[in-house]
């Protein structure tokens, strides 16, 4: 297994790259090195004793949100900040440095978990864990409108829809436990297209769709592992994310070569480079 994407380094840039300091995201600044290009030097990630890739340049940012409960994160429409769901019913907007710019209370009140966005329209979707339902969010009013009832199966406790991703006209939904399963629905018709049981995670948490190759990224908040998988559940690569105490939320930032996480326990924002 190899982490993706891998960009071959240019020998002529090797010495210059060695002299550069690690990138530090400061308030108001872009998280890309000044003078950076689309062909930055990159080396293969190291692997730990568990066979997990070790991410580079791990950084943490305070959000100032006191009540624990961050559950999901997605990039905003402009790619310069985030939407973060809180399971007490709030949807936050933050910058790259964790600064909160708005907090919208969602109606109805629910145990909100996974976030997703249709990038072609900017439509935001969110899932309600215990209800096992998908809603569309109006950020102006905070109104959440039901769009998919889903399948009410499995345990009756709070181990339902935990992660949500949108891609290629489909919803991908992670059911946390009992069963540990990923459902795929056609968004337009609401038809269930497939369901795949997974045996490797302890808790299915957030999902992210990778539109470069149609694969999924899945966080396991209990084992502290990030997995890149095919939609049939086949593992492509796995990463150690134990630097996040309880990694509930994840999003992929291909523009900057970063993985972003939110911690359910601390409400901190974390980043790490996969390059």
Predicted regions and their residues:
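Beta-rich, blade/repeat-based domains predominating
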Residues: 65-77, 109-119, 153-168, 199-214, ...
């Amino acid at each position: 297994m190899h982490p993706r994407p891998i960009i071959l380094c240019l020998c002529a840039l090797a010495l210059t790259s060695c002299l550069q300091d690690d990138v530090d995201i400061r308030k108001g600044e872009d998280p890309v090195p000044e003078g950076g290009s689309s062909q930055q030097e990159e080396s293969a990630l190291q692997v730990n004793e568990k066979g997990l890739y070790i991410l580079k340049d791990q950084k943490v940012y305070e959000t100032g949100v006191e009540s624990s409960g961050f559950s999901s994160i997605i990039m905003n429409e402009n790619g310069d900040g985030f939407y973060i769901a809180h399971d007490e019913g709030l949807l936050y907007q933050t910058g790259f440095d964790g600064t909160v710019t708005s907090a919208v209370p969602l109606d109805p009140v629910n145990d909100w978990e996974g976030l997703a966005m249709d990038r072609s329209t900017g439509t935001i979707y969110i899932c309600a864990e215990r209800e096992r339902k998908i809603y569309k969010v109006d950020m102006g009013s905070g109104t959440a409108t039901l769009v998919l009832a889903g399948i009410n199966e499995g345990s009756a406790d709070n181990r339902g829809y935990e992660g949500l991703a949108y891609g290629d006209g489909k919803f991908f939904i992670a059911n946390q436990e009992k069963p540990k399963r990923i459902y795929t629905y056609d968004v337009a018709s609401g038809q269930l297209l497939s369901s795949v049981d997974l045996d490797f995670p302890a808790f299915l948490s957030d999902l992210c769709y990778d539109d470069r190759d149609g694969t999924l990224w899945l966080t396991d908040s209990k084992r502290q592992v990030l997995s890149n998988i095919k939609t049939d559940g086949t593992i492509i690569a796995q990463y150690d994310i134990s630097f996040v105490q309880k990694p509930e939320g994840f999003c992929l930032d291909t523009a900057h070569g970063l993985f972003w996480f939110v911690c359910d326990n601390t409400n901190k924002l974390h980043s790490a480079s996969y390059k």
